[in-house]
Amino acid sequence: KMKEEGGMHVRFELHEEMTVKSDRLTPGETLRIHLPLPVVGAQVKSAALLSTSHPAAFIAPADEPQRTVYFELPYEPGMTVSAELAYEIEAPYCQPHAREVLAEQPTFDTEEMPPHVVFTPYLRALAKEIVGDETNALLKARKIYDFITTQAVYRFMPPYLTVTNIPEYFLSGLRGDCGVQAITFVTLCRLCGVPAQWQSGLYTKPDSAGHH
């Protein structure tokens, strides 16, 4: 359908809530809660906070890179804090062709970004083994993508904060979650001179929502 229509435009409405367990706070104690808000940019074309269950203490401005609605309330046992929000996505259909790739690629999004996007000797050697003599940037990216997605096993991860170098951690056992595989892809692409950047966020379905 996306190919036929050239893309897709979808409006999402989302309910999010948080309930604090009764043994975590005492009645009257200050409860501080952040609930995430969508950020306009990339494929997200509009976003709005429709309503909240309680008055918000602060709503992050639209230009914040990671937006939340913040509540500061006296705790009552069993209380639930919630928000209703909406956002619109425009996702164009894209089918890249290797023959259209320019030989000269931009230099932005090709640099190291410690501590995880680091061009270690091990990663340099592995990248050379994966891409071989390929010079086309799109085909390099495809080789890296195929290596990661066909050789790896999906596994849940410990907190990223505890991992010194995510790509090397992942490649040492070829096990990791979607974020680990993504940052490894970004690192190997950049190492090969292919511009790549990270994108993450909330995905929603009619019956569930999660981070991806």
Q: Where on the chain are the PLM-derived regions?
A:
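Intrinsically disordered, low-complexity N-terminal segments that are enriched in acidic
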Residues: 1-94
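Short intrinsically disordered, low-complexity coil segments enriched in acidic
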Residues: 2-5, 153-154, 212
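Solvent-exposed loop/turn segments at secondary-structure junctions
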Residues: 90, 151-154, 177-178, 203-206
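Hydrophobic/aromatic-rich core segments of domains that either
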Residues: 179-212
